[in-house]
């Protein structure tokens, strides 16, 4: 058979570049807008245009590519929609940093010129992550690549905003929002990360105006007292019932503020009395609304004290805090200071402490949208996998707050709202108006703010398919089939896509949502530059190849568990790649004389037991891989493939058929083995292709030289004809006997080259006959000089015994080893291990060590203990075997 020879070793970089270009040239990634095939579609979670490929991207996109290649091979009209996100604040920050190197700010350029500069930056650097995804092997339909600031997507954004506004779901109002003093913009609740930090609780005396004493107020933020407008107590607190309605003097500021009663106040926090600062706390803001309190802003957009701060004007908030505490102490208002640990909200982009601030913002009235999105999951229209995330989704949707969608930056979708400067008429339009609809004047001023980046991302499943136009792509691929994303953006993105998809399209945006976990280091720690534990995906691809890297990511993706990654694990699967390559080389060499067409008539009676067995095992593997992928159990699918290819195909089947392949005595039997070998190899490659696309294409083109790509060949399907439990049991028994003989050889330290004499005793004739069929396999793979198989045979003297179910295996020991010297060797080794075990167990029993040592060190010692204990068990078994031999 004229099949191409394989190189000595697999060269991943050469193969990756060659085959990716080949797939692109043949348009294999393209999906048809109109097709008779069933559609399967995925929209990519668009990476930031500023982004570089990190481990989270690598995992997310490897899983998507596995699914899209799998479904494409199953015959679906499979679309993987690619694109990037404009990433408002992140991108603006990057470009502002570039300007700073030139000694410029965005204000020096002005809005229009600055936006031009961002577009220029996007054109120069925005495609980096796309090229990196291609290196990973991602088979997106690149002809459809979208960007969230594309003209078409911008049109969709405006259209949805206008619809929401006219439906009464968008409003503008003064509200307390999370303000980032570094990014100079409001951010949503979801964009705030909370970090537990040590701080202080200051107890401050507020004297009554009438001189009748004072009330003690506890606060973690004394600088905000500059904006206090009341002191609040619980209406049911007996300590303060007669104090409600009185006035106190606000220290430092020296103005009168009232004592009010509100149910929000908890009686057991501090003294039970709290200061109310409406402009600096969302709860205080709500209380101020109920009690009609004045709202006094004390900070500017950079968290610097403004003109309302009196002598503290111009001070940073934390410097102001120190100065106010000093002044309170000096003036006799500070009663005490206590250590206090509390959660500090930080901007998830720049890690600056967020400042609650009152400002005029645009909001979406979210409850009506959330209700429909919640119901869709309850009714099963969208399935969340793993299901454990459903409870989190429901809880969040039930307690959702209105979404602040305006951002005080320049890069992004500018809010499509105009105000007439003549008559103050507000115009909300999906197109730029040229005149006022009220007074017909032409002097219009557009809203300065842009929309939250997540607003455009929420429209991604339908805007990328051409909406608001009713395109063929939209009709074919919406709702999409699957969304693969990290659980950390379930609320940022998934929930919002659900709400917008149902609102705009009247249907869910996807049928399934698979939420994968985070990629952590081997110890389970988050990867970070400061810890020095970051793994660079591109370096891993350079060093080990994309196939080994992809397979590692999938193999460690177990539902509900973080992906623990290390370079050693990736290297381990590089060995798997090498194993497949070497097995293929062996196969190709032994298929050289196989007929050009493999459609030869193979008689069933010429098929050997290993031929029948490997087909049964392959059929089970097909079922397990399909089941694993259909249920997003990527680790199970990988585990089945690894077990079958490495252990069953390479370690067993190839070894079992070598005598048949090397011999010319039985041509029909040899051809049957060749036929099975080729079919199993081809099917295995197809199963493996979604995980290892480059390796499988390289091999496929050598063994199936008809010019077709493996990526468009049919995916295997399980076949009931190959379900044969009897064959499986028979082969497993023979394999277990071979393994037991090998173990005995190892236990008594016999060289693999030393031929053995073995007696195998079965409990009945039927089982003896089955074993007799496997006689040659046992002789060859256990390296036997002689084997006797019978029923209820007597145990020979001087033999080592092994038990396999109801079968006894006796290995003759006479003349093979010096029992005395072997016993001495074992005793010496066991004593050494016992000594090491004692040292490690004492260390693990030491409370000081367990309390002070790092988790990784403790784990290392525990692993060492287990390894030593396992070795001791093996040596004990070998010693018993020797003693058994002496007795018999």
What are these regions (language model features)?
Residues 203, 395, 399-455, 459, ...:
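Feature 926 captures the class I aminoacyl-tRNA synthetase adenylation module centered on the KMSKS loop
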Residues 1-55, 78, 335, 348, ...:
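Non-catalytic terminal extensions that flank enzyme cores
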Residues 4, 9, 18, 22-26, ...:
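Residue patterns forming the tRNA-binding/recognition surfaces of aminoacyl-tRNA synthetases
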Residues 69-77, 98-111, 131, 135-140, ...:
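Secondary-structure transition/capping motifs at alpha-helix termini
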């Amino acid at each position: 058979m004229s099949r191409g020879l394989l190189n000595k070793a697999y060269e991943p970089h050469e193969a990756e570049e060659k085959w990716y270009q080949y797939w692109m040239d043949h348009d294999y990634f393209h999906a048809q807008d109109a097709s008779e095939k069933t559609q399967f579609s995925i929209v990519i979670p668009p990476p930031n245009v500023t982004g570089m490929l990190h481990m989270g991207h690598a995992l997310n996109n490897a899983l998507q590519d596995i699914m899209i290649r799998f479904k494409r091979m199953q015959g679906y009209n499979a679309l993987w929609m690619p694109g990037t996100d404009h990433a408002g604040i992140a991108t603006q920050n990057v470009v502002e940093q570039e300007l700073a190197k030139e000694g410029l700010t965005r204000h020096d350029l002005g809005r229009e010129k600055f936006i031009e500069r961002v577009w220029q930056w996007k054109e120069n650097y925005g495609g980096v992550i796309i090229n990196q995804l291609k290196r990973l092997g991602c088979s997106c339909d690149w002809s459809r690549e979208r960007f969230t600031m594309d003209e078409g997507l911008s049109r969709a954004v405006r259209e949805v905003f206008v619809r929401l506004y006219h439906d009464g779901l968008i409003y503008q109002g003064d509200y307390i929002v999370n303000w980032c003093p570094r990014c100079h913009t409001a951010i949503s609740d979801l964009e705030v990360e909370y970090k537990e930090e040590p701080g202080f609780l200051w107890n401050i005396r507020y004297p009554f105006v009438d001189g009748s004493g004072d009330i003690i107020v506890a606060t973690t933020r004394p600088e905000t007292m500059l904006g206090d407008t009341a002191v609040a107590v619980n209406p049911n607190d007996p300590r303060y019932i007669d104090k409600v309605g009185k006035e106190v003097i606000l220290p430092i500021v020296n103005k009168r503020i009232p004592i009010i009663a509100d149910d929000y106040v908890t009686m057991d926090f501090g003294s039970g009395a709290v200061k109310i600062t409406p402009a600096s706390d969302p709860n205080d803001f709500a209380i101020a609304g109920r009690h009609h309190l004045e709202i006094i802003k004390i900070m500017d957009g950079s968290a610097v004290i403004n003109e309302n701060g009196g002598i503290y004007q111009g001070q940073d908030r934390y410097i102001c805090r120190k100065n106010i505490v000093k002044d309170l102490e000096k003036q006799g208002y500070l009663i005490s200071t206590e250590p206090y640990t509390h959660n500090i909200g930080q901007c998830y982009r720049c890690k600056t402490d967020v400042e609650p601030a009152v400002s005029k913002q645009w909001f979406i009235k979210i409850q009506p949208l959330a209700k429909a999105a919640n119901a869709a999951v309850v009714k099963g229209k969208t399935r969340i996998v793993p299901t454990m995330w459903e409870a989190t989704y429901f809880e969040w949707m039930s307690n959702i707050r209105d979404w602040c969608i305006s951002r005080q930056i320049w890069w992004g979708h500018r809010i499509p709202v105009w105000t007439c400067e003549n008559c103050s008429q507000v115009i909300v339009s999906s197109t730029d108006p040229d005149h006022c609809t009220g007074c017909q004047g032409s002097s219009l001023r557009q809203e300065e703010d842009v929309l939250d980046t997540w607003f455009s991302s929420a429209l991604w499943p339908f805007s990328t398919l051409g909406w608001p136009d009713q395109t063929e792509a939209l009709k074919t691929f919406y709702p999409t089939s699957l969304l693969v994303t990290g659980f950390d953006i379930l609320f940022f993105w998934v929930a919002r896509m659900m709400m917008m998809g149902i609102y705009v399209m009247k249907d869910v945006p996807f049928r399934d949502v698979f939420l994968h976990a985070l990629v952590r280091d081997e110890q389970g720690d988050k990867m970070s530059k400061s810890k020095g534990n970051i793994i660079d995906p591109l370096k891993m691809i350079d060093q080990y190849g994309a196939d080994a890297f992809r397979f590692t990511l999938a193999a460690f993706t177990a539902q509900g568990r973080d992906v623990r990654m290390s370079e050693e694990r990736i290297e381990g699967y590089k060995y798997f790649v090498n194993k497949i390559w070497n097995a293929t080389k062996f196969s190709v060499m032994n298929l050289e004389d196989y007929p050009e067409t493999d459609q030869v008539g193979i008689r069933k009676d010429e098929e050997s037991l290993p031929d029948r067995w490997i087909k049964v095992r392959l059929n089970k593997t097909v079922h397990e891989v399909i089941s694993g992928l259909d249920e997003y159990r990527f680790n199970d699918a990988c585990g089945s493939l690894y077990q079958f290819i490495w252990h069953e195909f390479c370690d067993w089947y190839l070894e079992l058929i070598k005598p048949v392949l090397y011999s010319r005595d039985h041509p029909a039997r040899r051809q049957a083995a060749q036929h099975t070998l080729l079919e199993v190899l081809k099917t295995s490659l197809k199963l493996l292709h979604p995980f290892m696309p480059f390796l499988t294409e390289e091999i496929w083109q050598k063994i199936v030289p008809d010019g077709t790509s493996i990526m468009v060949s049919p995916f295997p399907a399980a076949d009931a004809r190959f379900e044969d439990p009897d064959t499986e049991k028979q082969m497993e028994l023979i394999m277990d006997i071979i393994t037991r003989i090998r173990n005995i050889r190892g236990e008594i330290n016999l060289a693999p080259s030393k031929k053995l004499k073995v007696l195998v005793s079965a409990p009945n004739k039927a089982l003896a006959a089955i074993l007799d069929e496997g006689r040659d396999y046992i002789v060859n793979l256990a390296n036997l000089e002689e084997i006797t198989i019978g029923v209820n045979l007597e145990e020979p003297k001087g033999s080592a015994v092994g038990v396999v179910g109801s079968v006894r295996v006796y290995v003759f020991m006479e003349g093979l080893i010096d029992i005395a010297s072997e016993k001495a060797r074992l005793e010496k080794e066991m004593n050494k291990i016992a000594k090491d075990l004692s040292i490690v167990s004492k260390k693990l029993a030491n409370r000081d060590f367990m309390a002070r040592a790092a988790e990784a060190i403790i784990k290392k010692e525990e692993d060492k203990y287990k390894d030593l204990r396992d070795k001791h068990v093996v040596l004990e078994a070998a010693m018993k075997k020797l003693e058994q031999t002496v007795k018999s």
